[in-house]
């Protein structure tokens, strides 16, 4: 609780910056956060802004009243985090404090998107990228959930394992990046205790990045688990550098490239990852912290 209190004071005291440093720092201004949120809501309609519910919201004056935070509700979570096995046959690149970038080489069964959003605008170089924890998880039975069963059948078979989460994203003034909050419920709608919610956080992150705290943007005592954003900007910088490096290498080996093409190619490198795509990529690496939560924005190839 002390950590949560100190974090709230830091959020309150940190001055707001409206100068964009996205390309160099991986951080966002409030205006860029809104732009990225609009893109997320447009591409994935299960995500929504808080809208006109002004009565129950603590407003920050540097954000529009109807765009204080993003929310998606009743996201299923059928297995606990320890049931997920770290993928084998991969290469990883450490980005500090336990975060690792993973490039997929094995034929694993990825969670598929349940919506029809087109992710073709995302840089091609990121399609094979995963971000995973570097802890040792227990192996789970691959036959536990047969594809022949529908979701309703699963609820009947294993009612005690099914949970739901409301996910919130707001803007962190102290780190100038998005910050994720999770509120969990049992399958009968009973709120989960903090210890129960921690069961759905990957073991390697529970003591590093997860904090129990009330939702700061809603009135009342809504207990949540927040994902500490201290490394988010650094991870985004690594992702952007990956895009630039990949496209730069492609330019060097392309025999069709001429001097006249340089300006267009340089523009492609500079614009490899747009600021409005920030939250889509942000949610990709959040899945390494909450592997059991079945985000419906998880796309094939990630």
Swiss-Prot record:
Name listed for the protein in its UniProt record: Autophagy-related protein 3
Classification via PANTHER family: UBIQUITIN-LIKE-CONJUGATING ENZYME ATG3
GO molecular function per UniProt: Atg8-family ligase activity
Region annotation (Handle region) ranges: 234-277
Protein purpose: E2 conjugating enzyme required for the cytoplasm to vacuole transport (Cvt) and autophagy. Required for selective autophagic degradation of the nucleus (nucleophagy) as well as for mitophagy which contributes to regulate mitochondrial quantity and quality by eliminating the mitochondria to a basal level to fulfill cellular energy requirements and preventing excess ROS production. Responsible for the E2-like covalent binding of phosphatidylethanolamine to the C-terminal Gly of ATG8.
Keyword Transmembrane: no
GO biological process, one term: autophagosome assembly
Domain notes per entry: The N-terminal region is involved in phosphatidylethanolamine-binding and is required for ATG8-PE conjugation.
Stretches the record annotates as Flexible region: 84-159
UniProt-listed InterPro entries: Atg3/Atg10 (IPR007135)
Compartments where located: Cytoplasm
Active-site residues, Swiss-Prot/TrEMBL: 230
Lineage: Eukaryota, Fungi, Dikarya, Ascomycota, Saccharomycotina
Regions of compositional bias (Basic and acidic residues) in chain numbering: 102-113
Chain intervals for the UniProt region annotation (Disordered): 102-125
Keywords: Autophagy, Cytoplasm, Protein transport, Transport, Ubl conjugation pathway
UniProt subunit comment: Monomer. Interacts with ATG8 through an intermediate thioester bond through the C-terminal Gly of ATG8. Also interacts with the 40 amino acid C-terminal region of the E1-like ATG7 enzyme. Also interacts with the ATG12-ATG5 conjugate.
Superkingdom field: Eukaryota
GO cellular component, one term: cytosol
């Amino acid at each position: 609780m002390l950590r949560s209190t100190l974090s709230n004071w830091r959020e309150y005291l940190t001055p707001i910056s409206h100068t964009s440093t996205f390309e160099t720092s991986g951080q966002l201004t409030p205006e860029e956060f809104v732009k990225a949120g609009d893109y997320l809501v447009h591409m994935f309609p299960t995500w929504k802004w808080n809208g006109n519910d002004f009565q129950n919201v603590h407003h920050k004056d540097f954000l529009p009243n109807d765009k204080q935070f993003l929310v998606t509700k009743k996201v299923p979570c059928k297995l606990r985090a320890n049931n997920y096995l770290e993928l084998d046959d991969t290469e990883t690149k450490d980005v500090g404090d336990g975060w690792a970038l993973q490039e997929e080489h094995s034929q694993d069964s990825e969670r598929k998107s349940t919506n029809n959003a087109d992710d073709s605008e995302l840089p091609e170089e990121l399609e094979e990228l995963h971000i995973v924890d570097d802890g040792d998880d227990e192996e789970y039975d691959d036959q536990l959930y047969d594809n022949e069963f529908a979701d309703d059948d699963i609820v009947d078979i294993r009612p005690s394992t099914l949970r739901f989460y409301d996910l919130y994203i707001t803007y962190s003034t102290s780190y100038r990046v998005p910050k994720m909050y999770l509120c969990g419920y049992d399958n009968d709608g009973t709120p989960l205790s903090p210890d129960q919610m921690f069961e759905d956080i990957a073991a390697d992150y529970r003591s590093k990045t997860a904090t129990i705290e009330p939702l700061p943007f809603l009135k009342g005592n809504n207990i949540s688990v927040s994902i500490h954003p201290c490394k988010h900007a650094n991870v985004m910088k690594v992702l952007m550098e990956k895009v630039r490096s990949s496209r730069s290498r492609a330019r060097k080996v392309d025999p069709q490239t001429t001097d006249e093409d340089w300006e267009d190619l340089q523009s492609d490198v500079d614009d490899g990852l747009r600021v409005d795509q920030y939250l889509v990529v942000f949610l990709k690496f959040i899945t390494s912290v909450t592997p059991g939560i079945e985000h419906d924005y998880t796309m094939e190839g990630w």
